[in-house]
Regions:
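Short proline/glycine- and basic residue-enriched helix-capping loop/turn segments at helix->loop/beta transitions
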Residues: 44
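Basic/aromatic recognition patch in beta-strand/loop cores that engages polyanionic ligands
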Residues: 38, 48-79
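Enriched for short, Lys/Arg-rich terminal
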Residues: 66-70, 74-106
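Conserved protein kinase catalytic domain
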Residues: 11, 18, 37-40, 83-86
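Arg/Lys-rich, positively charged N-terminal/basic patches that mediate binding to nucleic acids
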Residues: 1-33
Length: 106
C-alpha cells in the first residue's frame, strides 16, 4: 500500500480553488475538497490508476481528474507525491509542474 504525501504547494492550490468557489457556494467548495481527498486516497491501493496527461507524454507524472480540477502526482517507490492541483480548463504550465517537483526526493 502506497503512502500519500501532499506537498505544501499542492495543498495551497487546492485551498485557493476552494476559497474561490466558496465565495459563491461554500457547500460546493467543501464537497469538491472532500471528493478530491477521496479520489487521491484511492491511489494508496491503485497508484497507477491515474491517467498520463496528454501534455506530458514520456514524463513520469500522472493525473486524476475531479472536475473542475486536475491533480498531478508521481510515484516514487511506496510514496505518491501530490504535486499540483489546477483548474481543468486552464492550460498546464509544464515548467511550473517540474519546478514543484524539485523539492521532492527522487
Amino acid at each position: 500500500m502506497a503512502e500519500i504525501v501532499w506537498t505544501e504547494p499542492a495543498l495551497s492550490d487546492l485551498d485557493a480553488i476552494a476559497d474561490y468557489i466558496a465565495l459563491d457556494n461554500p457547500e460546493a467548495a467543501q464537497q469538491l475538497v472532500r471528493r478530491i481527498f477521496q479520489h487521491v486516497e484511492q491511489l494508496t491501493d491503485y497508484p497507477k490508476s491515474g491517467s498520463k496527461p496528454p501534455e506530458l507524454k514520456g514524463w513520469r507524472y500522472r493525473q486524476i481528474v475531479e472536475l473542475p480540477c486536475r491533480v498531478f502526482y508521481r510515484q516514487d517507490g511506496d510514496r505518491i507525491y501530490i504535486l499540483y492541483v489546477m483548474r481543468a480548463e486552464r492550460l498546464l504550465d509544464m515548467a511550473h509542474l517540474a519546478t514543484r517537483d524539485t523539492n521532492v526526493p527522487e
